[in-house]
Amino acid sequence: QCDWSSDVCSSDLVALQQITSRDRNPLSPSVLSICAINGGFTTNVIPSEVKLMGTFRAMDETWRFAAHKRIQEVVDGIARSTGAEIDLKIDVGYPTVYNDPIVTEKARSIAVETFGIDKVEDGEIRMGAEDFGYYSQKIAGCFFRLGTGNKQKNIISGVHTPTFDIDEDAIEIGMRMMATLGATL
């Protein structure tokens, strides 16, 4: 809150983006996205308050918490330099999912043996939040994705969309994979 909240908001936005481009290890992916900016209702009145909302995700827990600290430092610095009152709330969120290399290779081998090499794809690193991260921080595990789409049945929408659907034939495949993993590991 201050007399020039829009300017402070802009300063925060630019400065926060420097964290993932300047402060991180370039070999450890992370993303900071400001996804909502709310403040003001007209063109000729400076809003008394502007609210920024976003998300920060990282592939390394040490960096994740160091970045949280850095975000606080950046925001505090802007508050001091502008005289603004800035209330920062960081929801820690889900921990990073860690795929244990041994368990992951075993799961991949089981999938290839059970369903065939043409049905197994090695996925790329993703920045999604997943509660499985709580498990993978405690015990060796492997997070894998079960393909549930089917172009022939026009089941093509991604998760978190209003038209999401699954090909129910995938349920049997998932059950077989989980049962084989459970019996093997």
Regions found by a protein language model. Give the residues of each.
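Single conserved hydrophobic/aromatic residue that forms the stacking wall/gate
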Residues: 1-8
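Metal-dependent amide/peptide-bond hydrolase catalytic core
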Residues: 13-185
